[in-house]
Regions:
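Residue-level detector of Asp-centered blade-edge/turn motifs that repeat once per structural unit
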Residues: 139-141, 184-185, 228-229, 273-274, ...
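Hydrophobic beta-strand positions that form the internal "hydrophobic ladder"
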Residues: 145, 189, 230-233, 275-279, ...
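A structural "domain/chain start" motif
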Residues: 22-61, 65
Length: 404
């Protein structure tokens, strides 16, 4: 039963249906951990014309979605974005100065440009630059989210923006697929597909669209995750009979087996940010729990003890691990600080929240939420903002993977 349980976790998705300092005198909106800096775009000229208006609308939405700012409609705020937006030849140009008027501090002074057909992309770039300059963390506006869509029994992988727009379909074969994950540079996507009738691992080059089968050992090939340096791939293989955790050198093809369990199985590997450890799921104690093991091998250390089942670990950029925990009959998203050994439950509604994936800002998490047998991808804010539905289309959407 142990193996059957963990194999369900491995391939169940196939059947799934449903830091910079801020001066003390800067005005803060709100209280507690989710306090926001007030920010205004009202001193940005050129936003009443067609492209400028579109730029303003997207930038305002991006900055609000970042969670760090309270965007005001009046001209004065703790952070003011000044400058102008204009069209020059075939390009849209945004000249931006981001300042704190109370102190005179200039966070950012830069000119950005993009083809006239890429105004949305330009706004995303500016938003990320503002977040990085003011808060010292990566922005998420330009990031992408891969996920699986299921319609009329056909499953494919798609990519969309962090705002749910610009949806692009990557696969068109309708074959059962699961576990999409990004390369560290964001130029390729790895996933498991039953395209040839067996669970094999594939790689899609996002520049050329070329698909390559890279792991097709006998039995299960699943849960691929690429190391931060891009040289190694952790995955689950059953080529020797039992689903075990392996690391494969992507250049030489050399395999290193990390686990050796007789009656249990391992799944869902996730690399630590420094590439030295791997989090994974094992049912060696009778129920699926999360463990950590050195990337070179050794004795695994159990990480989770609360919850009947703990699955789908995703190691975030700041060292915390998000996972799905079955508590009070439902799967909820939780976050554990590996060093402090503290555990925080992020969701609490009596619906299932599964398959968490960290955003590059270390604040937001994408997950699959299932309610009434219908699944959609939602974005959670670990600092308290309300969750937001990302997918607004028909069918089921799940297994999100946020780009680096």
């Amino acid at each position: 039963m142990k193996v059957k349980k963990i194999l369900y976790l491995l391939v169940g998705a196939v059947l799934f249906v449903g830091q910079s300092a801020v001066c003390e005198d800067i005005r803060i909106v709100g209280e507690g951990a989710n306090s926001k800096l007030s920010l205004t775009l009202e001193q940005l000229s050129g936003c009443r014309k067609k492209e400028g208006l579109r730029f303003y609308s997207v930038l305002k939405s991006d900055l609000t979605r970042s969670g760090w700012f309270k965007v005001l409609t009046k001209p004065k705020a703790a952070i003011e974005v000044k400058g102008r937006v204009f069209v020059s030849g075939g390009s849209v140009v945004a000249e931006c100065n981001v300042v704190a008027p109370a102190t005179g501090r200039c966070y950012l002074s830069k000119s950005f440009s993009a083809p006239a057909c890429s105004t949305r992309k330009l706004a995303h770039t500016v938003s990320d630059a503002i977040v990085l300059a003011v808060k010292g963390v990566p922005g998420i506006a330009s990031s992408k989210i891969a996920m699986i869509t299921s319609k009329s029994g056909k499953k494919d992988i798609v990519i969309c923006g962090a705002d749910g727009q610009d949806v692009v379909k990557l696969t068109h074969d309708g074959a059962p697929c699961l576990s999409p994950t990004w390369s560290p540079k964001g130029n390729a996507l790895y996933y498991t597909s039953f395209f040839r009738g067996f669970p094999d691992v594939y790689r899609i080059d996002l520049n050329s669209g070329r698909r390559t089968r890279i792991a097709s050992y006998p039995g299960i090939n699943a849960g691929a995750d690429i190391s931060p340096n891009g040289k190694l791939m952790a995955l689950t293989l059953s080529k020797d009979g039992n689903p075990e955790l392996y690391v494969r050198n992507l250049r030489s093809g050399k395999l290193t087996r990390l686990t050796k369990t007789i009656s249990a199985a391992e799944a869902s590997p996730s690399w630590s940010p420094d590439g030295r450890q791997i989090a994974f799921v094992s049912d060696t104690t009778g129920s699926p729990q999360i463990y950590i093991i050195k990337a070179s091998g050794g004795k695994p250390r159990r990480l989770t003890f609360r919850g009947k089942e703990n699955v789908s670990p995703d190691w975030g950029p700041d060292g915390r691990i998000a996972y799905s925990s079955r508590r009070s009959g439902r799967y909820q998203i939780c976050v554990v600080d590996v060093e402090k050994r503290t555990d925080k439950q992020i969701t609490s509604e009596y619906v299932d929240h599964e398959q968490p994936s960290w955003a590059p800002d270390g604040r937001h998490i994408a997950c699959a939420r299932t309610e009434g047998y219908i699944s959609g991808v939602y974005v959670l804010d670990t600092m308290g903002d309300a969750q937001v539905r990302l997918t607004q289309f028909k069918g089921d959407w799940y297994a999100p993977a946020w780009s680096p």
